[in-house]
Every structure is written in C-alpha cells, then in structure tokens.
Amino acid sequence: MDKFLVRPDLRDLQGGGEEPAPTGGASGDLKSPDWRHLRAEGLSCDYTVLFGKAEADKIFRELEQEVEYFTGALAKVQVFGKWHSVPRKQATYGDAGLTYTFSGLTLTPKPWVPVLERVRDRVCEVTGQTFNFVLVNRYKDGCDHIGEHRDDERELAPGSPIASVSFGACRDFIFRHKDSRGKRPRRTVEVVRLQLAHGSLLMMNPPTNTHWYHSLPIRKRVLAPRVNLTFRKILPTKK
C-alpha cells in the first residue's frame, strides 16, 4: 500500500481550492506550526497549512494579478533532445546576479514582487531558512501537470531545502524512489503520495532530491487553477 501524509476532505478532491481545517501557523502560533513529518528511506519532508483560507485567497488573487509568466521560447522544455510546450505556465523571480538552468533553459529571475516577498518572508520566519529565488508554476486545471523529476540542479546551494507553497486547487503530489522507476526497477520501494492543500507549505529537506523523484500528475476531475511557489537557495553566478 502507498504511504499517505494528508487526507483532505471531499471538497479538496474536487479541486475547489479549499484546504482542510488549518493545522499550522495560520490559526495558531506562527513560529510553532503544527508540522506533519514524512519520513522514508532517503526522504525527509515536513508539511503544514501555513496560511488560513482568507489570507490564502488574497495571496492567490495577488499572484494572478502580479506574476508575469514566460512566453515564446521560454515556454518550452527540452526532453531527450526535443523541445516541447510546457504543460503549465512558469516564471522565475529572485535576487539580482542569479541564474538558474533546468530543462535546457538558463533563466535570469525577474526582481521580486511584493506578494512573492511576503510569502517568502513568512516561510523564512517559520523555517529559519533563507531563500533567494522562486520558481512559479501555474496549473490552469487538472490537465496541466509536471512529470517525474528531481530538483538537483548544480546552482542549488548544497544542503539547502526546497520550500513548496501551494495556492488554489488541491492536487496530488507523488514521490517515487529512483530505484523503483521504469519497467524493470532495481527493487520495489513504496510510492509516497500526499495532497497539497490551499495555503500549504511542504519542505523538501536533503537528501530527498538525491533519492526521490516527484511529480504532479494529470487529474482531469480538477477544474480549478493552482499556483505553486518553490523557494530555493541559489549560488551566485560565477563571473
């Protein structure tokens, strides 16, 4: 049987962007959120609902207004040497002097906008971590998705976690161990599944991205949009 971290109510399964009863700083002590800890072989993640519904709704509206997404060539991804349209919208924001390379693209982030700074600062406050870059992914509905991958780019600061903050529709999120992938896996390792609620924070701690791939699969029943912010600590570009 697959492992589960969170079981939301039926409203979440319909993709309406509602979150379960707040379990984190949104309703209690901001600096002491109610974390749910997910542990497996080589996997270390922590989950909480960080923003209550009213605040999460407000942030979602501001993200829809303020974030400028890639178009043209920047809206394509390279897979096995071929270029394909990205099945979601993407944008990058961060500190000056940074670049980030993934899927065949080298990107220079846009300057921070207020809503992204506000979310970043909240995440830093409750985790004690610092982040200088964010990748924004917008999924218009359950047909938009991202395949199995690891966030292991060379620009990432060694030993730094990745903070994933979700707004909008609740979506399934799946971890698969690198040894259990493909038609002839080396061995069987339980898949780890969770559902990322509106206003939630998932901390992916080392060495998770060394051993586990993660994905956001197609879910046609989900009709509402979702915006995900993955905050990272990037090494300055060498000159």
Curated annotation (Swiss-Prot):
Cofactor names: Fe(2+)
Binding site for Fe cation: 149, 151, 214
Region of interest called Disordered, as start-end residue ranges on this chain: 11-32
Top-level division of the source organism's lineage: Eukaryota
Every Fe2OG dioxygenase domain range: 130-235
Effect seen on changing residue 214 to A: Reduces activity
Keyword Lyase: no
Motif (PCNA-binding): 3-7
Record note on disruption phenotype: No visible phenotype, and no effect on the level of 1-ethenoadenine in genomic DNA in aging mice. In contrast, the levels of 1-methyladenine in genomic DNA increase over time in aging adults.
Effect listed in the UniProt record for changing residue 151 to A: Loss of activity
One of the Pfam families matching this protein, by short name: 2OG-FeII_Oxy_2
Organs and tissues of expression: Detected in liver, testis and kidney (at protein level). Detected in heart and testis.
Activity regulation: Activated by magnesium ions.
Any one biological process term the GO annotation gives: DNA alkylation repair
Main localization (coarse): nucleus
Co-factor binding comment: Binds 1 Fe(2+) ion per subunit.
Enzyme class: oxidoreductase
PANTHER family: ALPHA-KETOGLUTARATE-DEPENDENT DIOXYGENASE ALKB HOMOLOG 2 (PTHR31573), DNA OXIDATIVE DEMETHYLASE ALKBH2 (PTHR31573:SF1)
Family: Belongs to the alkB family.
Free-text comment on this protein's domains from its UniProt entry: The PCNA-binding motif (AlkB homolog 2 PCNA-interacting motif, APIM), mediates the colocalization of ALKBH2 with PCNA at the replication foci, coordinating the repair of alkylated DNA damage with DNA replication.
Subunit structure: Interacts with PCNA homotrimer; this interaction is enhanced during the S-phase of the cell cycle. Interacts with nucleolar proteins NCL, UBTF and NPM1. Interacts with XRCC5-XRCC6 heterodimer.
Protein name (record): DNA oxidative demethylase ALKBH2
Provenance organism: Mus musculus
